[in-house]
Curated annotation (Swiss-Prot):
Residues 32-47 have a biased composition (Low complexity). This is Beta-lactamase 2. Pfam families: Beta-lactamase2. It catalyses: a beta-lactam + H2O = a substituted beta-amino acid. It comes from Streptomyces cacaoi.
Length: 314
């Protein structure tokens, strides 16, 4: 079995994992209502002995070693408050996963009528990886259509046009600060924000911080109910997530995710809300990069990290 092989390969790895947090437990609001912003439970070691390391840490460390990467994972069961946290407070490039949060901010800022406003742009505005916007230079696109393109197709030009409606990267950064996120640093637009270099803090966040932001928009009370449903629909119908978190969850679980891919260092991300038929949703963020500029990352890594989370929280 896959997980047995991983565990056996890392019996000696646990002692080296002093940075890995432990599981936490807490109580949440009713499943019938949106969660208040900022209601996510924080990690706690109260139920564990000092220095005790969770078994899942060895499995995630094994994946780091097998794929020769740096891996960050944060997941929370929004019903029980239990967490899986591995390098969850360390910085990683967020790449295109920000587009889910950007569209949450756009929905929050604009009325339904404003979301139907057509945005005009020219060929000069087009950047790489713009499969939807490149087809609508003549007629333009509504804010709703731009969000659909940004979240479901990771369209870079759509993301840049949406940036203009929320005050640019700095404006979105300030919006996230309003959610309690004082970690994320947003500075550049596409495609430059995906060109991360080791040691840089520009356009980075932590697995925990970005997951909490996604939770606030999708499950919290930041957005009106109709806007939450719209963002959820975009995420659930994402076209770029096959082989990532979707490939690692259990049968019957429904995933709404946003992926990200960096230009260098094999940087790869997937961030999701996962709805289970027999429990409250999970919120999961996996962030990865390699150690060399030309590194290539196999998407299997994110799927297998998701399997570890599913085993622990499922």
């Amino acid at each position: 079995m896959l997980h047995t092989r991983i565990r056996r390969a890392t019996l000696g790895a646990v002692a080296a994992l002093s940075l890995v947090p432990v599981m936490a437990c807490g109580q949440e609001s009713s499943a019938d209502a949106a969660e208040p912003a900022g209601s996510a439970p924080s990690s706690s070691a109260a139920a564990h002995k000092p220095g005790e390391v969770e078994p899942y840490a060895a499995e995630l460390k094994a994946l780091e070693d097998e794929f020769d990467v740096r891996l960050g994972v944060y997941a929370v069961d929004t019903g029980s408050g239990r967490e899986v946290a591995y390098r969850d407070g360390e910085r990683f490039p967020y790449n295109s996963t920000f587009k889910a949060l950007e569209c949450g901010a756009v929905l929050d800022k604009h009325t339904d009528r404003e979301m139907d406003r057509v945005v005009k742009y020219s060929e000069d505005d087009l950047v790489d990886n713009s499969p939807v916007t490149e087809k609508h230079v003549e007629d333009g696109m509504t804010l709703t259509a731009l969000c659909d393109a940004a979240v479901r197709y990771s369209d870079n030009t759509a993301a840049n046009l949406l940036f203009e409606t929320v005050g640019g990267p700095k404006g979105l950064d300030k919006t996230l600060e309003g959610l309690g996120d004082h970690v994320t640093r947003m500075e550049r637009v596409e495609p430059f924000l995906s060109r991360w270099e080791p040691g840089s803090k520009r356009d980075t966040s932590t697995p925990r911080a970005f997951a909490k932001d996604l939770r606030a928009y999708v499950l919290g009370d930041v957005l009106a109910e109709g806007d939450r449903k719209q963002l959820t629909t975009w995420l659930r119908n994402n076209t770029t997530g096959d082989g990532l978190i979707r490939a690692g969850v259990r049968q019957g679980w429904v995933v709404g995710d946003k992926t990200g891919t960096g230009s260098y260092y094999g940087a790869r991300n997937d961030m999701a809300v996962v709805w289970r038929p027999d429990g409250r949703p999970l919120v999961l963020n996996v962030m990865v990069h390699g150690h060399t500029k030309d590194a290539e990352l196999d998407s299997e890594l994110i799927a297998r990290a998701t399997e570890v989370v599913a085993d622990r929280l499922g």
